[in-house]
Structures are given as C-alpha cells and as structure tokens.
C-alpha cells in the first residue's frame, strides 16, 4: 500500500486534486507531487461576481474572488508542472447551493451552504469528474482525517482542533469516503501547510484564508435572498413568548435564533430571538434563558456509525462551538433525537447537528424547528 492506502506505487496512482486557488489545496497538490503521485488539478468555476449584482468594492477582505482564485490555481499547477482543468459548474452550484440557501431562509431556517456545497458539487459531482479523468482518488485540502475501520474507511476530526472541518463534512457518504483522501488532516497546524507551499515556491504560500460565504462576499445574506425572491422580506410582528406584540420587523430573513441586535426594541432587559414563525410571519423574542434547549430533533441524517440505535455521543450544533455530551436516539427513516446533558442556547433550525465519539465522526443531520419535535 502507498501513503494513500492504495495498492499501487505512487507513480501509477492518479490523484485528482480539487484546487480552489487557496494555500491548503495547493499544498496538497505539491505534497502529492513531491511523493511521486500522478497529480491532476481540477478547479470549479462556481460563481461569477460580475453577474451577482455586487460591486467588487463592497466585498469584505478575505472573501473569495472566483476569477483570481482560478488564476491562482492555474499558476500553482504551472509551478508544479501538473495538468490543470477548469470546469464550469455555475449552473449546478446555483441550483444545489445558492437556491437552496435562499429557500432555507424563506423557511425561517439558518442555512450552512458550505455543507451543501461539499455534499453536492464538490463530492458528488467533482468525484464523478475525478473518476472520468482516470483518478484513483480525489484529494482535497480539508482538515479532517480518513481512517481505516472494521466496516470501511471512517471520518475523523483533524489533528489540529483549531483547523478541524469535520462539521462541514458530516454528509459525506461511505462510498465517497472510499474514494476521498485528506492529506492535510494530520498536519499540526496551518504553519505546516504554509511551509509546504513555501518550500515549493508556490505563489499562494502567503495568501490569506477566505472567511465569508463565497457567493455572498459582501456579507449581506438578506440582499441575496431578496434578489432571488423579491417578496421574501415580508414585514411582520415582533412578539414576546406570551404573544404580546412588542414591535414590527422587516422580514424573517433578517433574523436567526439567538440574535439580539437589530430588533429595534429599546429599553427593558435584553431580548433575544427565540423562534421564527413562517406561518404567522412573527419573530418571537424572549430572555436568554428562553434560548435553552435540551432536546433536538434532527432530520436527513447521514449515518457513518454502527448498528446502535441509542448511544452516548458528543454533538456540535454550530461549527464554532465545542462538542457537548448527549444521548443520541436513532429513529425511523433518516431522523434522530438528541438529548443534551446540559442545555445549549441558540440552537437554530437549518444548522447542522453533528455526532462524535471521541475524534470519530458518526454522522449528523439538520436541526428541525421545535414545533416539529
């Protein structure tokens, strides 16, 4: 077996690398080339800022810029002397990621588009492209680990907790894991990745990480939803948990669970968004204690564990939060129930709930509104 757990010498192993133009995927291509693999780079054209209606000057620092990123990916491929292909996936990305993002907001949920992009465009579609190119594996720059297990490869967190991206990859299927490789998962930190890029004199060695959603580089999510659905921002009432009207709002798309700012309610104790009601158009506000949640209903579960139907786990309800201890009950179909040991605040429908045992990812799903509990 070679270093990618493939029964071939590296020189006979074709690895297709998903090259975004950033330092991580560029370092992956360089590392595999250095190890003697037959490396092919592929970059996806996903989003054209010129047709987005956003002025380039309005973009935040450290956001994606499709044209420059493609240019950077090609420059890296040229520096490494590897073939490089740019594929137009704009229509697929618009349908499966951008439109779903907007639709999730219309349902008064808070989306995580990076998960949908990984699940559909990057792993479903790009994986097919990699096979068409004769690849034995598809490698990406994600900070996660792929480990052999009794029932096949398992998904594990990245070695560096600060860089771990497993939350965004919970929807990866077993079949996809069989073909995927994550060479950066065992890296001690970003400095090690940048050192690889610098050693190979790659033009992106010092490039900053992108921070915002690539198709909303100005950070104005509501404006994007409104461009796609002009009637999305319907005004409505702001009420307390007893139903008393406290004020008015300019549309549910401007709010998420746990939000405090932007309510326009002066005076009194701090109030937080505790529920969004798409049926009535109401924003429900309450105290910080009203945000407490002990039981979470989860749908569209992707399961990577064993046959257990009830087990102790740790769960993440947002990518930036530490995993919290809980009891997981797998229900019929693709549903699950999570009972937390201690209340979590601001559990938002539409976000992912990801299940862990130690460093292993057991899967995850999408958080349902409490009314569906």
Swiss-Prot record:
Q: What class of enzyme is it?
A: transferase
Query: Which InterPro entries does this entry report, sorted A to Z?
Result: MnmA-like (IPR004506), MnmA-like_C (IPR046885), MnmA-like_central (IPR046884), MnmA-like_central_sf (IPR023382), Rossmann-like_a/b/a_fold (IPR014729)
> Which residues take part in binding ATP?
18-25, 44, 141
Intracellular or extracellular location(s):
Cytoplasm
Query: Which chain positions carry the site (Interaction with tRNA)?
Result: 142, 351
Against HAMAP family, the record matches this protein to: tRNA_thiouridyl_MnmA
Question: Which residues carry out catalysis?
Answer: 117, 214
Q: Which Gene3D superfamilies match?
A: Adenine nucleotide alpha hydrolases-like domains, HUPs, Translation factors
Does this entry carry the keyword tRNA processing? yes
Protein name (Swiss-Prot/TrEMBL) = tRNA-specific 2-thiouridylase MnmA
Q: Please cite one Gene Ontology biological process associated with this protein.
A: tRNA wobble position uridine thiolation
The family classification in the record reads: Belongs to the MnmA/TRMU family.
Write the Enzyme Commission number(s) for this entry: 2.8.1.13
Question: Where does the chain cross the membrane?
Answer: none
Q: Which gene encodes it?
A: mnmA
Q: Which domain of life is it from?
A: Bacteria
Question: Which Gene Ontology terms cover its molecular function?
Answer: ATP binding; tRNA binding; tRNA-uridine 2-sulfurtransferase activity
User: Which keywords has UniProt assigned to this entry?
Assistant: ATP-binding, Cytoplasm, Disulfide bond, Nucleotide-binding, RNA-binding, Transferase, tRNA processing, tRNA-binding
Instruction: Give the disulfide map.
Output: 117-214
Where are the residues of the annotated region Interaction with tRNA? 163-165
The protein's role, per its UniProt record: Catalyzes the 2-thiolation of uridine at the wobble position (U34) of tRNA, leading to the formation of s(2)U34.
Pfam families found in the cross-reference section: tRNA_Me_trans (PF03054), tRNA_Me_trans_C (PF20258), tRNA_Me_trans_M (PF20259)
| Reaction(s) catalysed by this chain's protein | S-sulfanyl-L-cysteinyl-[protein] + uridine(34) in tRNA + AH2 + ATP = 2-thiouridine(34) in tRNA + L-cysteinyl-[protein] + A + AMP + diphosphate + H(+)
Q: Which GO terms describe its cellular component?
A: cytoplasm
């Amino acid at each position: 077996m070679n270093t990618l757990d493939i029964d071939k010498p590296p020189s006979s192993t074709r690895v297709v690398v998903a090259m975004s133009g950033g330092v991580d995927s560029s370092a992956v291509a360089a590392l595999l080339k250095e190890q003697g693999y037959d490396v092919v780079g592929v970059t996806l054209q996903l989003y054209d800022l010129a047709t987005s209606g956003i002025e380039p000057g309005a973009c935040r620092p450290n956001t994606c810029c499709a044209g420059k990123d493609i240019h950077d990916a090609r420059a890296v491929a040229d520096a490494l002397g590897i073939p490089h292909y740019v594929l137009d996936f704009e229509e697929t990305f618009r349908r499966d990621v951008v439109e779903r993002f907007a639709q999730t907001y219309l349902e008064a949920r808070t989306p995580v588009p990076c998960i949908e992009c990984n699940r559909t465009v990057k792993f479903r579609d790009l994986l097919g492209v990699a096979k068409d190119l004769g690849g034995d594996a598809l490698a990406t720059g994600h900070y996660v680990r792929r480990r052999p297990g009794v029932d096949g490869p398992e998904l594990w967190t990245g070695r560096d907790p600060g860089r771990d991206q497993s939350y965004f990859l919970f929807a990866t299927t077993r079949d996809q894991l069989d073909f995927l490789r994550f060479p950066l998962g065992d890296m001690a930190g970003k400095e090690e990745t940048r050192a690889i890029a610098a050693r190979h004199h790659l033009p992106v060695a010092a490039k900053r990480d992108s921070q915002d959603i690539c198709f909303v580089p100005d950070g104005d999510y509501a404006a994007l939803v409104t461009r796609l659905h002009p009637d999305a921002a319907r005004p409505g009432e702001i009420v307390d948990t007893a139903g008393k009207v406290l004020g008015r709002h300019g549309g549910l798309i401007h709010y998420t669970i746990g939000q405090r700012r932007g309510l326009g309610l002066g005076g009194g104790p701090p109030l937080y968004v505790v529920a969004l009601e798409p049926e009535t158009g109401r924003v429900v506000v309450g105290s910080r204690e009203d945000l407490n949640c002990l039981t979470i209903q989860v749908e569209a579960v992707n399961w990577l564990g064993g046959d257990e139907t009830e087990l102790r786990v740790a769960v993440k309800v947002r990518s930036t939060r530490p995993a919290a201890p809980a009891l997981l009950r797998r229900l019929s179909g693709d549903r699950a129930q999570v009972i937390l040991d201690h209340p979590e605040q601001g559990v938002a429908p539409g976000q992912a709930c990801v299940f862990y045992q130690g460093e292993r990812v057991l899967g995850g799903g999408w958080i349902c509104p409490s009314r569906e509990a």
